[in-house]
């Protein structure tokens, strides 16, 4: 019987352990940031240990970094976390993409941009959205702080192999519909737990037609479907993306092995889901988890359970309303889901020549300094600023309420991020997940509009 892509990569990294039992996996790349690493470093000190492989460990600063004045960190806890990582990186010999560096940015942006993220690797990070890197054909997953320490000390991790779930996506995406809409629709249709216990492999002609940046958007939100892992088979698009990047120094030697990373034709999956995107519409979430979403022209559903009732109360909405009825106050273009160059380009097409609605506060936060530099070379900063957007420095920003960028209590925000939980963007903030183009159109119109009519 053939093997799935996931099984092939997993099996190559097993150090010990029987099939069906927890197995010890070798970790090829460990990415860290300032929030989940301090206690892990302290654990090493208490045990008088060093990092097993500092050369396979890379740090960046992202969650707490201010996006207006990056060196003016007013919050004491945030400042301590940042300075602690800077000191720990120096003490333990870890390369850090520090504040002010041209390579600093959100951890799931930095890995791919530098070429650290490569097909066939096992990649971990103390962050929920590590599956982003699975778009390259890597096994990438988020871990907790105690596991961060375990990888520091041993460069390995005990894991139980999940089942395999194939998501086959076919059809041509309509104009104005994007990768973000694919993953939001899948979660809306199948729930926030359909991937629990599975490794997701996204495949099909639609996936193969996507850019690497669009593929990363889909894998980024695998965790919102309950899955620890999301993967796509690497192909020529992948190889061209990796080629020439600073840390892809063995490209010409590795590419032959990468070409073997695919699911065999006779491989069996434990479950298969199919999706035809030919008639897919732009998606908007109305509630407090990514499952609570609708296609743009679909009314919000009737209350089915206590979770729906609570979500409607929190969001200040009612069944039967539509996305265009939402009274928006903020628009956020950013996060590790949708703050790449192509995302900003898509949004700029909508924004160019227009002005932000007077009722809207709109900010753009490039996901990394690399993206910011490239965007400014293209003049995107001028397009956004001329329209009335705030053009910020890189960081996690308004994706989560851990830094100065927060949505006020009770205000609705069109956001390109990945989570719309209660209080995710600040106390009482009401988050609506959409694609960059949808967010941009909302900023201009002061409400959600059908972006397909804007970008035609």
Curated annotation (Swiss-Prot):
Bound cofactor: record note: Binds 1 [4Fe-4S] cluster per subunit.
One GO MF term: 3-isopropylmalate dehydratase activity
Pathway the protein acts in: Amino-acid biosynthesis; L-leucine biosynthesis; L-leucine from 3-methyl-2-oxobutanoate: step 2/4
Binding of [4Fe-4S] cluster, residues: 336, 396, 399
Keywords annotated in UniProt: 4Fe-4S, Amino-acid biosynthesis, Branched-chain amino acid biosynthesis, Iron, Iron-sulfur, Leucine biosynthesis, Lyase, Metal-binding
Disulfide bond residue pairs: none
Enzymatic reactions: (2R,3S)-3-isopropylmalate = (2S)-2-isopropylmalate
Biological process terms in GO annotation: L-leucine biosynthetic process
InterPro entries per the UniProt record, alphabetical: 3-IsopropMal_deHydase_lsu, Acnase/IPM_dHydase_lsu_aba_1/3, Acoase/IPM_deHydtase_lsu_aba, Aconitase_4Fe-4S_BS, Aconitase_4Fe-4S_dom, IPM_dehydratase_rel_enz, IPMI_cat
EC number: 4.2.1.33
CDD domains noted in UniProt: IPMI (cd01583)
Needed cofactors: [4Fe-4S] cluster
Family that this chain belongs to: Belongs to the aconitase/IPM isomerase family. LeuC type 1 subfamily.
Function field: Catalyzes the isomerization between 2-isopropylmalate and 3-isopropylmalate, via the formation of 2-isopropylmaleate.
Subunit text: Heterodimer of LeuC and LeuD.
NCBIfam families per the UniProt record, alphabetical: leuC, PRK05478.1, PRK12466.1
UniProt xrefs under PANTHER family: 3-ISOPROPYLMALATE DEHYDRATASE (PTHR43822:SF9), HOMOACONITASE, MITOCHONDRIAL-RELATED (PTHR43822)
Name this protein carries in UniProt: 3-isopropylmalate dehydratase large subunit
Native organism: Staphylococcus saprophyticus subsp. saprophyticus (strain ATCC 15305 / DSM 20229 / NCIMB 8711 / NCTC 7292 / S-41)
């Amino acid at each position: 019987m053939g093997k799935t892509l996931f099984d092939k990569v997993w099996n190559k990294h097993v150090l010990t352990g029987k099939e069906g039992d927890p197995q010890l996996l070798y970790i090829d790349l460990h990415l860290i940031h300032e929030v989940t690493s301090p206690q892990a470093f302290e654990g090493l000190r208490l045990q008088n240990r060093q990092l097993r492989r500092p050369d396979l460990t890379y740090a960046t600063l992202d969650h707490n970094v201010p996006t207006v004045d990056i060196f003016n960190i007013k919050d004491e806890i945030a400042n301590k976390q940042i300075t602690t990582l800077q000191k720990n990186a120096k003490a333990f010999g870890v390369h850090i993409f520090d504040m002010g560096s041209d390579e600093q940015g959100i951890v799931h942006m930095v890995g791919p941009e530098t070429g650290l993220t490569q097909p066939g690797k096992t990649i971990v990070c103390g962050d929920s959205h590590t599956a982003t890197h699975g778009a390259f054909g890597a096994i990438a997953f988020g871990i907790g702080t105690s596991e961060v320490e375990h990888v520091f000390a041993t460069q390995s991790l005990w894991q139980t192999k999940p089942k395999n779930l194939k998501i086959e996506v076919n059809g041509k995406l309509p104009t104005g519909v994007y990768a973000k809409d694919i993953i939001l629709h899948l979660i809306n249709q199948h729930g926030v737990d359909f991937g629990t216990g599975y490794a997701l492999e996204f495949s099909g002609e639609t996936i193969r037609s996507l850019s690497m940046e669009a593929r990363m958007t889909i894998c980024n939100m695998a965790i919102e479907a309950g899955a620890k892992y999301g993967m796509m088979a690497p192909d020529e698009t992948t190889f061209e993306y990796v080629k020439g990047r600073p840390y892809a120094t063995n490209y010409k030697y590795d590419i032959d092995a990468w070409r073997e990373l695919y699911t065999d034709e006779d491989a069996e999956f434990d479950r298969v889901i199919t999706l035809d995107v030919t008639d897919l519409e732009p998606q908007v979430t109305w509630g407090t988890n990514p499952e609570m979403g609708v296609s743009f022209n679909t009314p919000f559903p009737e209350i089915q359970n206590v979770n729906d009732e609570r979500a409607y109360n929190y969001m200040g909405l009612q069944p039967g309303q539509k996305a265009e009825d939402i009274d928006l106050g903020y628009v956020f273009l950013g996060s590790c889901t949708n703050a790449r160059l192509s995302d900003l380009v898509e949004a700029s097409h909508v924004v160019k020549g227009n002005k932000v609605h007077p009722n809207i506060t709109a900010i753009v936060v490039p996901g990394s300094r690399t993206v910011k530099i490239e965007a400014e070379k293209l003049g995107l900063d001028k397009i956004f600023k001329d329209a009335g957007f705030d053009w910020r420095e890189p960081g996690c920003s308004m994706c989560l309420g851990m830094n100065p960028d927060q949505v006020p209590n009770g205000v609705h925000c069109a956001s390109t991020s990945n989570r719309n939980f209660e209080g995710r963007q600040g106390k009482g903030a009401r988050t609506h997940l959409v694609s960059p183009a949808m967010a941009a159109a909302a900023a201009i119109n002061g409400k959600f509009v059908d972006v397909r009519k804007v970008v035609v």
